[in-house]
Amino acid sequence: DPADLEVLVEKEIVTVDLKQLALLTLYVDYQVREPEERAEDIYLYFSHYAFHDLHIEDMFHAGRENLTETEQFWNDWISLLKTKSGDTESRLLKEAVLYREGIEGLVKMANDNYKVHPSLYLEAMNEYDKNYGYSQIEKIGENAIEKIDSKLIIRSKIALKAACASSYLNHTEKLMLFCWESFRSDSTVRNLLRLFATREMAEQYGIRAEKALASRIKGNPITSIRNYELNQNIINN
């Protein structure tokens, strides 16, 4: 049982390279399962701590023999992860799509699957950011804020990322709009203050946002819970 082994390693009763052992476990499981069973069975291992941070593509290089029928596995793997929410699932889906289809494929996946994995938009933006693709980031941001529920906190993060891209492009109007949308989805004091960065922004959005925040605090003083992927999908009260 992987969970039992984790306890033994944690208590220093045995010394094992858990990552390598976990990869070998996936590698062997892949070999012994029928092709149509592999994706579902391998996915179950990721409920164990030792598997959380594994990259599925490393599984293919864990043993001496090349794994076969990989095309079906990747298709089944992506189809499965599209239906599963959570931090680990989102990461695995991102990595699988990037590995198979590149950034454009990741953007398409975000467009098709934003209700389950809205964070894929942000992941695609981060990939474009590595090569200073500010125009692509801005375009993704515009699309994302139209699609994603305005009450989801992940939408605020996406809007803020797009605002940074707009600042590099000197697109002032879009910068201000993204900052406003960021505030709408996560009405923190920090996001409010950002709307007062310039006189023009304060006049268009800042004063309106200040009134909205004051009204919200008065009506609901309880701070909403904020976490990462799982809580980014929680709609605020």
Model-derived features with residue positions:
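Eukaryote-biased, non-catalytic alpha-solenoid scaffold regions
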Residues: D1-N237
